[in-house]
């Protein structure tokens, strides 16, 4: 049950974080923020 909230949190974080990371390092692989965790 807590996993759903955790996924929502990750999603909101990645939505903010991904564009920033793309601007900082476009050379790196464009992976979702939570992909490294699972």
From Swiss-Prot:
Entry keyword set: Apoptosis, Cytoplasm, Mitochondrion, Secreted
Tissue-specific expression: In the testis, expressed in Leydig cells at 10, 20 and 60 days of age (at protein level). Also expressed in pachytene spermatocytes at day 20 and in vessels, peritubular cells and spermatids at day 60. Not detected in Sertoli cells (at protein level). In the adult ovary, expressed in stromal cells, granulosa cells, theca cells and oocytes at diestrus and proestrus (at protein level). Expressed in the anterior pituitary where it is detected in lactotropes and somatotropes with lower levels in females than males (at protein level).
Induction (UniProt): Repressed by estrogen in anterior pituitary cells. Induced by estrogen and progesterone in astrocytes. Induced by growth hormone and Igf1 in Leydig cells at 10 and 40 days old but not at 60 days.
One GO cellular component, as annotated: mitochondrion
Location in the cell: Mitochondrion; Secreted; Cytoplasm
Pfam families: Humanin (PF15040)
Entries under InterPro entries matching the protein: Humanin (IPR028139)
Domain of life: Eukaryota
Swiss-Prot/TrEMBL GO biological process terms: apoptotic process; cellular response to amyloid-beta; negative regulation of apoptotic process; negative regulation of neuron apoptotic process
Disulfide bridge partners, by residue number: none
Keyword Ribosomal protein applies: no
Keyword Mitochondrion: yes
Its job: Plays a role as a neuroprotective factor. Protects against neuronal cell death induced by amyloid-beta peptides. Also protects against excitotoxic cell death. Prevents amyloid-beta peptide-induced spatial learning and memory impairments, protects against amyloid-beta peptide-induced suppression of hippocampal long-term potentiation, and inhibits amyloid-beta peptide-induced activation of STAT3 and inhibition of CASP3. Prevents glutamate-induced dendritic atrophy in hippocampal neurons and also prevents glutamate-induced decrease in SYP puncta number and total puncta area.
PANTHER family cross-referenced by the UniProt entry: HUMANIN-LIKE 4
Name the record gives this protein: Humanin-like protein
Lineage of producing organism: Eukaryota, Metazoa, Chordata, Craniata, Vertebrata
